[in-house]
């Protein structure tokens, strides 16, 4: 156990060491300041603007949101077309046929919304063209969209008496060119050097040791997709087993690299926020709140998996190894599970369906908190900002003062946008789950019975309703109902909060800051950190405790038999 603790501490320290300079770099990218890559990339940036006819004029929230929706709609149609027509497209050495309408619809919605829910196995369903041109491109632009919207939200707090929140096309292009592409290139090269597959060759047929039996070994341009799937908190695997598959994640070292990649940008964005508002203590307060919840989750899942529950009492074991890779063990699997669900990533290096009941509860609850414990790139932090405003509002009600955050007064319109930002994902999750358990097709999709069977359904719709994408693998997802309803859930969960965040930003940008007084609530001390954690956890608990009681909590009590 002490080695697991040392591993976790080393991981968190290394993550912070890498994230701080990256956050400073991203702040410079946000404000348009020159960076060390500018000499190489500025000509590319200018050429890109001319090629696309991009105006650098500021946009209102309405126009910014319209640009996001139009761009995402084009991407959605493009991905659907690629998936349904892949049988006629190049780079298809295995002759993969086009996907059905419902599966293509679900997959397009999944990747456009940065969810990467997969109701298919990549190596047996998709061609190289579909993976690299269709899905990998969306991994870049969906991540860039989330960061661009966060830029707009931050401007709302640092600008005053403005009617605009920035330019979407400029933000999108700069995020992709200066942040995502360089990081992905470095990570892809590093992964290839460690044995991750990157090839356009045909699948390889090999002769096994079992009486000369033949086996088909899947290949493909995996490393380039894995790099951005982790950095962009996308999570969709090139292969069906995701990061549990040796061709995606061959060693403990690559496991460390991929976990760092999952959390690197979300953590760096918090650092960037502190720089942007000219008060690093604000960023540290948010970081501390996120990190406390994250560490508690790591401890809970690790203890649950290491000691395996009442069923193993009195038995000498090395922990619950069902569904885990020996090369990662309990420690590496638990840390990965916590990271991927805290960060809205969804990649897995172990089967979450095989986690102990309480071990599976932690990833589920991380998602149900609204993916704000670091969360998705961009979306996680603007979601947390919504919770911060809610916390300030509640505190203001308690003391009878007009609430304010970063010098901007919180008004009824702001709270309406915050309510949309916070409440849409849990409502989608609960309604989707309730509707699903009544459908015969969904009941037939569940491998387990009783409380664990309900947990599989709840986890699936929690994942889609919060744009995570991971799953309890016992749930058979490729049905018309799950594909269509899940696709709509993913789109609503992505774009309704996103639009609300933009309108919140515009309203904030139009205000003049007010001077802090002796009665102003400090949002950077220990008391506020505790209050913020309480609000985040309480909203999640009030929303999901009844459902959790029917699922993983009830499943835990069955282990006492």
Curated annotation (Swiss-Prot):
Taxonomic superkingdom: Bacteria
Stated name of the protein: Potassium-transporting ATPase potassium-binding subunit
Transmembrane segments: 4-24, 65-85, 134-154, 177-197, 253-273, 285-305, 380-400, 417-437, 484-504, 528-548
Role of this protein: Part of the high-affinity ATP-driven potassium transport (or Kdp) system, which catalyzes the hydrolysis of ATP coupled with the electrogenic transport of potassium into the cytoplasm. This subunit binds the extracellular potassium ions and delivers the ions to the membrane domain of KdpB through an intramembrane tunnel.
Membrane topology per record: Multi-pass membrane protein
GO cellular component entries: plasma membrane
Location of the protein in the cell: Cell membrane
The protein's assembly and partners: The system is composed of three essential subunits: KdpA, KdpB and KdpC.
GO molecular function per UniProt: P-type potassium transmembrane transporter activity; potassium ion binding
Main location: membrane
Keywords linked to the UniProt accession: Cell membrane, Ion transport, Membrane, Potassium, Potassium transport, Transmembrane, Transmembrane helix, Transport
Family of this protein: Belongs to the KdpA family.
Pfam family name, one: KdpA
């Amino acid at each position: 156990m002490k080695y697991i603790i040392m591993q976790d501490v080393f991981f968190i320290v290394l993550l912070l060491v890498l994230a701080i300079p990256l956050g400073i770099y991203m702040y410079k990218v946000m404000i348009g300041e020159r960076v060390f890559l500018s000499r190489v990339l500025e000509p590319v940036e200018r050429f890109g603007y001319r090629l696309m006819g991009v105006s650098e004029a500021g946009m209102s929230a309405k126009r910014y949101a319209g640009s996001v929706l139009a761009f995402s709609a084009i991407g959605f149609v493009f991905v659907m077309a690629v998936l349904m027509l892949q049988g006629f497209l190049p780079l298809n050495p295995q002759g993969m046929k086009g996907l059905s309408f419902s599966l293509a619809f679900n997959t397009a919605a999944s990747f456009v919304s940065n969810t990467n829910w997969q109701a298919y196995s990549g190596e047996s369903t998709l061609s190289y063209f579909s993976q690299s041109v269709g899905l990998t491109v969306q991994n870049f632009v969906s991540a860039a969209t989330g960061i661009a919207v966060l830029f707009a939200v931050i401007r709302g707090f640092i600008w005053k008496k403005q009617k605009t929140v920035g330019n979407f096309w400029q933000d999108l292009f700069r995020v992709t060119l200066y942040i995502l592409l360089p990081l992905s290139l470095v990570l892809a090269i590093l992964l290839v050097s460690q044995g991750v597959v990157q090839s356009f060759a045909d699948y390889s047929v090999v002769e096994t040791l079992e009486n000369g039996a033949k086996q088909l070994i899947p290949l493909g341009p995996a490393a380039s997709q894995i790099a951005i799937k982790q950095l962009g908190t996308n999570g969709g695997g090139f292969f069906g087993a995701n990061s549990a598959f040796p061709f995606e994640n061959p060693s403990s070292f690559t496991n460390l690299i991929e976990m760092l990649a999952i959390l690197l940008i979300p953590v760096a964005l918090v650092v960037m926020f502190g720089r942007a508002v000219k008060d690093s203590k604000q960023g540290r307060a948010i970081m501390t709140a996120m990190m406390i919840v994250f560490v508690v989750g790591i401890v809970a899942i690790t203890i649950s998996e290491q000691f395996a529950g009442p069923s193993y009492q009195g038995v000498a074991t090395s922990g619950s190894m069902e569904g885990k890779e020996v090369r990662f063990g309990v420690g590496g699997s638990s840390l990965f599970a916590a990271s991927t669900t805290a960060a809205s990533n969804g990649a897995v290096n172990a089967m979450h369906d095989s986690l102990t009941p309480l071990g599976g509860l932690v990833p589920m609850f991380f998602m149900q908190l609204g993916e704000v414990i670091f969360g998705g790139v961009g979306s996680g932090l603007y979601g947390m900002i919504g919770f911060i405003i809610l916390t300030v509002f509640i505190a203001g009600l308690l003391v009878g003062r007009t609430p304010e955050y970063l010098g901007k007064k919180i008004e009824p319109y702001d709270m309406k946008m915050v309510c949309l930002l916070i409440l849409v994902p849990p409502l989608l999750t609960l309604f989707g789950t309730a509707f699903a358990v009544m459908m015969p097709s969904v009941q037939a999709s569940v491998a387990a019975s009783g409380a664990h069977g309900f947990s599989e359904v709840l986890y699936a719709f929690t994942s889609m309703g919060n744009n995570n994408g991971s799953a309890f693998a016992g749930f058979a997802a490729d049905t018309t109902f799950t594909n269509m309803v899940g696709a709509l859930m993913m789109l609503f969960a992505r774009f309704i909060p996103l639009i609300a965040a933009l309108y919140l930003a515009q309203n904030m940008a139009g205000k003049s800051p007010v001077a802090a007084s002796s009665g102003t609530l400090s949002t950077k001390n220990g008391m506020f950190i505790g209050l913020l954690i309480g609000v985040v956890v309480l909203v999640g608990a009030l929303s999901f405790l009844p459902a959790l009681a029917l699922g993983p909590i009830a499943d835990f009590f069955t282990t006492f038999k």
